[in-house]
Swiss-Prot record:
Organism per entry: Saccharopolyspora erythraea (strain ATCC 11635 / DSM 40517 / JCM 4748 / NBRC 13426 / NCIMB 8594 / NRRL 2338)
Disulfide bridge map: none
Listed EC numbers: 2.1.3.2
Gene expressing this chain: pyrB
Protein name, per record: Aspartate carbamoyltransferase catalytic subunit
Pfam families registered for this protein in UniProt: OTCace, OTCace_N
One MF annotation (Gene Ontology) recorded for this entry: aspartate carbamoyltransferase activity
Function: Catalyzes the condensation of carbamoyl phosphate and aspartate to form carbamoyl aspartate and inorganic phosphate, the committed step in the de novo pyrimidine nucleotide biosynthesis pathway.
Length: 310
């Protein structure tokens, strides 16, 4: 891989290689008192986040450090960005200072692609950690890793993605990747939260959740992104929860093997009931744990591309 910007252009062989590497890394580190591999020693990884993040930012930082890379965090508010410096100039500065890889989260859709274009001649590689409402490829990869652990191969599996599709970069990335890996995807949301052009995503679209439950292998719940909304997309949080929330009654209607995912942060009591979030059938903590190993695998494929040094 030259960069990781989206899952839309990720072929099955590359995606599977990353997932397999993540599994190998997880097993390699299992039970170790010191979780450290020398694979990326001497490499410099910079995280550049223009939006708030807990899981993704910490996960990338841990991933880089566990691979022995030097990890530098650039905060938009505490850097020259706060003085008005452009994304392009900031990126070129970081590359000139020796960054081998820049991990970027930005509120503008397409920001990671533009960054990769500006840095193409420098050799610095780019990972998209979420760009606006466009994509979040490493989230989709860690979701796929979690599903593979719970369900085995994903070909032929049926996965529902439920909630705020309109504002969700997670939904877009997951649809592309799950379909590439052979899964069937059904999108479930109120009509007001379905984006234009969704018919080109290659997934089924439904507006009612309950009829879908008995035939699902997995349900991925999305947070309602109120911070991106300017208007009434549904009558109330209570009515949304009644129609689309994963409660104990709905959990009981899923097949026994079915797994519940959530990319976080969760709104307990809205899209997911606390009892469901804490149920053994939910793999939410596993997603976070797998996120570290998947991001280690992404950095490995971008920066090393050799046998994993144990």
């Amino acid at each position: 891989m030259r960069h990781l910007l989206s899952t839309e252009g990720l072929d099955a062989a590359t995606a599977t290689a990353v997932l397999d590497t993540a599994g190998t890394l997880k097993q390699t580190l299992l039970g170790r008192e010191v979780r450290k591999l020398p694979t990326l020693r001497g490499r410099t990884v910079v995280t550049m986040f223009y939006e708030n993040s807990t899981r993704t930012r910490v996960s990338f930082e841990v991933a880089g450090k566990w691979m022995s890379a030097d990890v530098i965090n650039v905060s938009a508010g505490a850097s020259s960005v706060g003085k008005g410096e452009s994304l392009r100039d900031t990126a070129l500065t970081l590359s000139a200072a020796g960054a081998d890889c820049v991990i970027v989260r930005h509120p503008a859709s397409g920001a990671a692609h533009r960054l990769a274009g500006w840095l193409e001649a420098t050799g610095t590689q780019v990972v998209n950690a979420g760009d606006g409402m466009h994509e979040h490829p490493t989230q989709a990869l860690l979701d796929a890793a979690t599903l593979r652990e719970r369900l085995g191969e994903l070909a032929g599996r049926r996965v529902a993605i439920v909630g705020d599709l309109l504002h969700s970069r997670v939904a877009r990335s997951n649809v592309h990747l799950l379909r590439t890996l052979g899964a069937q995807v059904v999108l479930v949301a109120p009509p007001t939260l379905v984006p234009a052009g969704v018919e080109h995503w290659g997934a089924e679209v439904r507006h009612e959740l309950d009829p879908e439950l008995p035939g699902l292998d997995a349900v991925m719940l999305l947070r309602v992104q109120a911070e991106r909304m300017h208007g009434g997309f549904f009558p109330s949080a209570r009515e949304y929860s009644i129609a689309y929330g994963m409660n104990e009654a709905r959990l009981a209607r899923l097949p026994e093997h079915a797994v519940v995912l959530h990319p976080g942060p969760m709104l307990r009591g809205m899209e997911i009931a606390p009892a469901v979030a804490d149920s053994p059938r939910a793999a939410i903590t596993e997603q976070v744990r797998n996120g570290v190993h998947v991001r280690m695998a992404v950095l490995y494929h971008l920066l090393a591309g050799e046998e994993i040094a144990a």
